[in-house]
Amino acid sequence: MSNIIKQLEQEQMKQDVPSFRPGDTVEVKVWVVEGSKKRLQAFEGVVIAIRNRGLHSAFTVRKISNGEGVERVFQTHSPVVDSIAVKRRGAVRKAKLYYLRERTGKAARIKERLN
């Protein structure tokens, strides 16, 4: 029984997901439905958390919009997510960057990873 479930989940997983880590700046393009129209919307920010659970994997992206912090959780293999592009690599030493929620301005900056 579990082999069938694993096989079905494997078929539904996206193959073109780039590798990214917490601290990286990513641009996620998401399909948005407004009335009868369907369009792509970009959400660019810093990855503050990743949850690896196979088909149920998710990641949290944080950005500052009009001086207000906005966080959005994306399901990695969701059909709503069109593409994920890594804009900048960040050098951090923690897996969850929740401390960035309390920081603003220059204190919330992340060093760039050079390799």
Curated annotation (Swiss-Prot):
One GO MF term: structural constituent of ribosome
Any coiled-coil regions, as ranges: none
GO cellular component labels: cytosolic large ribosomal subunit
Keyword Transmembrane part of the UniProt annotation: no
Superkingdom per UniProt: Bacteria
Keyword annotations of the record: Ribonucleoprotein, Ribosomal protein
A GO BP annotation: translation
Similarity section: Belongs to the bacterial ribosomal protein bL19 family.
Function: This protein is located at the 30S-50S ribosomal subunit interface and may play a role in the structure and function of the aminoacyl-tRNA binding site.
PANTHER family in the record: LARGE RIBOSOMAL SUBUNIT PROTEIN BL19M (PTHR15680:SF9), RIBOSOMAL PROTEIN L19 (PTHR15680)
Protein name: Large ribosomal subunit protein bL19
Organism per entry: Citrobacter koseri (strain ATCC BAA-895 / CDC 4225-83 / SGSC4696)
Encoding gene (name): rplS
